[in-house]
Design a protein with these regions (language model features):
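N-terminal cap/lid segment of alpha/beta-hydrolase-fold proteins
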Residues: 19-55
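Conserved alpha/beta-hydrolase
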Residues: 81-105
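Short beta-strand/loop motif that positions the catalytic acidic residue
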Residues: 247, 253-255, 259
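Alpha/beta-hydrolase-fold enzymes
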Residues: 141-226
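Catalytic nucleophile-loop/oxyanion-hole region of alpha/beta-hydrolase
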Residues: 72, 78, 99-135
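The serine-hydrolase catalytic nucleophile loop
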Residues: 66-82, 265
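Catalytic active-site module of serine/aspartate enzymes centered on a nucleophile-bearing elbow/loop
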Residues: 280, 284-334
Length: 334
């Protein structure tokens, strides 16, 4: 009888396993058109770009955060937009809706942490072919930062010359309370398609209220998330937290004192790993920075720093956010 019960529960859990979006055979050379990034398995991911008036001095591949999409790099209420600002500074800027987000297929389903890292790497390779002999940079926001870390620390990293990690998603299981880990596992394996809204958490992502209101009205911005998608994101954050100290290119790590999304303790642990090999690695801490700092009311200050870092990773940042950044991060009150 006990054996039958065990088989029953095993079958039940298997039927409720976390779902990952399907992929096709990798039989296509990735390519980009005006509005599409065609992946190696034949999926059409929506893309957008902002180009400079003259020959670009650099190419930027921007990777959005969880539940967001490429619009996050465009002009938004009360913020100038990463794409337009960097294009005006001389960069060709590209962004895409990662699979499962925005206008891309399988919206709401977790695409798999290795798959979205592969998509980033393939897009970077495609841009490298399109713009030979021009530096290629990557900017990743939250989940996008975790994607970049995972791709760049793989056995076959893409040809990126420098990276900017904006409040990267490093809230790994090792930095979570045990109760959170248990609840996440149970939720993902018993009711994976359930969509808790998170409205009762009371967390604020930015001081740009008009931008937040605009996002809340945007049908492409995901407001209710499947539990198994959160589970998949946590797998990605595990990889990012484990590998952030292995970034092989000059990298700028940004974090804000008012970030209510990625906990400070997880960030401190990640930053210590990140600086274990300090050559080419910089940290900037913004006293007035929120999680969506590239869309905050003070976003332009951060964008000026990013531009300065990409032009010369060894020079101090114009804002001074890199001065005593780690000490200020560790002593900041939350």
């Amino acid at each position: 009888m006990r054996a039958l019960v065990a088989v029953f529960w095993a079958a039940t859990l298997a039927a409720c396993a976390p779902q990952v979006a399907p992929t096709g055979p990798y039989s296509i050379t990735p390519s980009i058109s005006e509005t599409i990034f065609l992946t190696a398995d034949g999926l059409s991911l929506h893309k957008r770009h902002w180009l400079p008036a003259a020959e670009p001095q650099g190419v930027v591949l921007a990777v959005h955060g969880f539940n967001d999409y490429s619009k996050s790099f465009d002009v938004v209420p009360d913020a100038p937009g990463v794409g337009p600002v960097l294009a005006a500074a001389g960069y060709a800027v590209y962004a895409y809706d990662q699979r499962g987000f925005g206008k891309s297929p399988h919206v709401g389903l977790w695409p798999g942490e290795n798959q979205i890292a592969r998509d980033f790497a393939d897009f970077a390779l495609t841009l490298d072919r399109r713009y030979p002999n021009i530096p290629l940079y990557a900017i990743g926001v939250s989940m996008g930062g975790a994607v970049i870390i995972t791709a760049m620390t793989s056995d076959d990293p893409p040809p990126v010359d420098a990276a900017v990690l904006v409040a990267p998603a490093v809230w790994s299981r090792s930095t979570m309370p045990f109760s959170y880990r248990i609840a996440l596992w149970l939720g993902a394996h018993t009711m994976p398609s359930a969509k808790p809204s998170g409205r009762g958490l009371g967390r604020q992502a930015s001081d740009n209220i008009e931008m937040l209101r605009d996002a809340s009205r945007d049908l492409l911005f995901i407001k209710e998330t499947r539990i198994d998608s959160i589970y998949g994101l946590t797998n990605l954050m595990d990889l990012a937290q484990s590998n952030v100290g292995r970034m092989p290119v000059p990298t700028l790590y940004l974090y804000g004192a008012k970030d209510q999304i990625i906990p400070k303790n997880a960030t401190v642990i990640a930053v210590e790993k990140f600086l274990s090999e300090p050559k080419g690695r910089r940290v900037a801490f913004y006293d007035n920075g929120w999680h969506m700092m590239l869309r905050d009311l003070d976003a332009e200050r951060v964008l000026v720093d990013i531009d300065a870092f990409l032009k010369d990773p060894s020079q101090p940042l114009p804002s001074g956010a890199d001065i005593d950044a780690v000490e200020r991060l560790k002593t900041a009150k939350k």
